[in-house]
């Protein structure tokens, strides 16, 4: 199969398309495992469909037999793909056989003839021709939604901060008593959900681009995983484990990112937590590894994701001959990164203190092949949808050590769900520029630098040479067909580096220009305020209303009451010979003309926090942008209140 087969099943990012996801939602037994964005080690995505057999374990006593059946089928040439609940690990220790377990399956795997695979670099889709043809035809004829939309999730924590702090205090007692060194303490967030699982997964993977994503249709349950963590990868006799321990929120800009990344790298607490888990996993894999083959290849690397930085380490080992699937999981599962150390005693503490079974959260999702290959994630950042009860659960947790602070740990847990609550739709980067038939581009280096910085921040593909080539073509078209004058040129860059450019004639402003305040209070922690993107619905709606009322722009404040900016301009006031403009940290976009003014010797411009009264009492009020430059504005008399 080549490009032609891939058209209807893949989107332009090389991920499974909305239609393919919708088909997977309608067909129990389907497993999609995706690598996004598809790095060198994770360039292949998989679609397992039409299982030959389903292997389930509903009880602890049934787990071993289920694993043996999977092992047998894989040796006979089948592929196996599915998931294990955290509590499936109780089956490997006699002392856990009486512990609480979830009502959902402890283990669920489909056995398949062969998956459909996608090479993320080439975009080539391959697989059994009958399966590809069947799915393409099914996708073509299925009842489709008009667009992939879903309801907003309103999560409630199943454990209050007070109850969490009570459990946290008991963990500290166990640490002081020497029972444990670290406990990964977790709880659930829950929400009502009756919309499309496929649409929600499509939005989740836009918001959290990871190498170990999964969509698993178990029937009444659907698992949506955006896990960044590799549990283990098997390649013949070579094993790789990559525990993740250590988290910090990303900044709002590249500069803040650098500060946060350095803070995590230099955190003694996080390094100590990571080292504990590395030692635990070295011991676990050592049970099935050739003597002397276990080594730590990398320690405490910092990896960047959409909303957080994570610290990871990489462990490699060579398996002993004859080690099969049951023994691998018996030795490794669950991952020590989601238990703590020492593992067995800590699992007992977790069972005592956590209020409900974890289920598939902190379990694992992945596949085995007949060629002794396997990839499994640690099922964090994983949403479990129960279609019968029309509900969704999302687990969160953190590693608690002796110097942890309970309030901070609770906040870290909630942080890990932030990507579900942000605006999850895809977006592009924008630059709105001025081109003049006599002077050419205005502030072009400022525009390109800002787009490059935002592209780096969000992980967009950016090529300065390609952009300049596109802009040269625009100039040729304008000179050939549009005549003299000034033009508004709007450039949009999408995540994969595709460029779209539109232009229109820029008319002169006539008469006095007026502005008013917006009633909205913006959150200065919203990272999208610091980048010019298509994700600007509030700005567009407020500007449209203001223009209909005859205003040039509408001015915003943040939740602290500080002035930020206009919907299409930055704000300045003049006091004597000095111009003042709000600092970026208030929630301000680094406008290109604003940046030009701050670096110019012609104007005395400095940053200062401003409030509505400062604007109302200023000697003069201005707004500025790259299209209009510096524009003197005023409040009409009837709008002279904040």
Task: Name each model-derived stretch.
Residues 2-432, 554-558, 642:
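Extended alpha-helical targeting/anchoring segments
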Residues 274, 307, 311, 408, ...:
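Helix-start/capping segments and mature chain N-termini
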């Amino acid at each position: 199969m080549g490009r032609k087969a891939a058209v209807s099943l893949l989107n332009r990012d090389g991920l499974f398309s909305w239609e393919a996801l919708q088909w997977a939602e309608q067909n129990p037994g389907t497993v999609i495992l995706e690598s996004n964005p598809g790095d060198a080690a994770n360039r292949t995505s998989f679609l397992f469909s039409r299982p030959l057999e389903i292997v389930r374990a509903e009880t602890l006593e049934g787990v071993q037999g289920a694993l043996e059946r999977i092992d047998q089928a894989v040796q006979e040439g089948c592929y196996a793909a599915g998931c294990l609940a955290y509590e499936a690990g109780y089956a490997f220790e006699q002392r856990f056989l009486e512990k609480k377990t979830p009502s959902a399956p402890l283990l669920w795997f489909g056995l398949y003839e062969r998956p459909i695979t996608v090479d993320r670099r080439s975009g080539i889709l391959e697989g059994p021709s009958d399966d590809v043809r069947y799915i393409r035809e099914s996708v073509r004829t299925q009842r489709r939604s008009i667009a992939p939309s879903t309801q907003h999730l309103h999560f409630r924590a199943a454990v209050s901060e007070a109850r969490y702090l009570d459990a946290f205090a008991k963990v500290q007692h166990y640490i002081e008593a020497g029972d444990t060194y670290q406990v990964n303490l977790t709880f659930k967030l829950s929400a009502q959900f009756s919309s499309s699982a496929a649409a929600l997964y499509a939005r989740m993977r836009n918001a959290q681009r990871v190498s170990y994503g999964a969509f698993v249709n178990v029937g009444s349950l659907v698992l949506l995983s955006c896990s960044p963590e590799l549990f283990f990868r098997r390649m013949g006799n070579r094993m790789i484990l990559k525990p993740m321990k250590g988290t910090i929120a990303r900044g709002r800009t590249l500069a803040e990112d650098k500060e946060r990344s350095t803070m995590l790298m230099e955190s003694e607490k996080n390094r100590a937590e990571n080292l504990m888990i590395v030692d635990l996993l070295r011991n676990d894999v050592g049970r099935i590894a050739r003597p002397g083959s276990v080594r730590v290849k990398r320690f405490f690397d910092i990896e960047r994701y959409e909303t957080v930085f994570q610290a990871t380490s990489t462990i490699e080992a060579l398996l002993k001959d004859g080690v099969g699937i049951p023994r691998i999981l018996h030795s490794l599962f669950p991952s020590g990164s989601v238990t703590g150390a020492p593992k067995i005693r800590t699992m007992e503490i977790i069972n005592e203190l956590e209020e409900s079974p974890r289920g598939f959260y902190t379990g694992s999702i992945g596949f085995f092949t007949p060629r002794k290959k396997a990839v499994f994630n640690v099922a964090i950042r994983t949403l479990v949808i129960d279609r019968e009860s029309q509900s969704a659960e999302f687990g969160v947790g953190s590693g608690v050590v002796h110097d942890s602070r309970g309030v901070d740990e609770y906040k870290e847990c909630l942080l890990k769900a932030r990507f579900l609550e942000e605006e999850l739709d895809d977006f592009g980067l924008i630059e709105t520029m001025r081109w003049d038939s006599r002077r050419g581009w205005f502030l072009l280096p400022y525009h390109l630098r800002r787009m490059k910085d935002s592209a780096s921040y969000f992980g967009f593909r950016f090529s300065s040479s390609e952009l300049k080539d596109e802009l040269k073509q625009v100039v040729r078209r304008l000179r050939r067909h549009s005549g003299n004058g000034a033009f508004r040129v709007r450039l949009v860059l999408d995540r994969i580096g595709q460029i779209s450019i539109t232009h229109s004639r820029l008319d002169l402003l006539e008469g006095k220009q007026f502005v008013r305040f917006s009633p909205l209070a913006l959150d200065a922690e919203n990272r999208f305020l610091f980048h010019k993107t298509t994700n600007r619905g509030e700005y567009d709606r407020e500007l449209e209303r203001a223009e209909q009322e005859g205003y040039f722009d509408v001015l915003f404040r943040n939740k602290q009451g500080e002035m930020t900016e206009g919907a299409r301009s930055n704000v300045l006031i003049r006091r004597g010979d000095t111009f003042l403009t709000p600092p970026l940290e208030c929630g301000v976009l680094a406008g290109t003309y604003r940046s030009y003014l701050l670096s110019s010797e012609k104007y005395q411009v400095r940053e200062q926090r401003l409030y509505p009264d400062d604007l109302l009492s200023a000697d003069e009020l201005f707004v500025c942008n790259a299209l209009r430059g510096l524009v003197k504005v005023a409040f009409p008399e009837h709008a002279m209140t904040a």
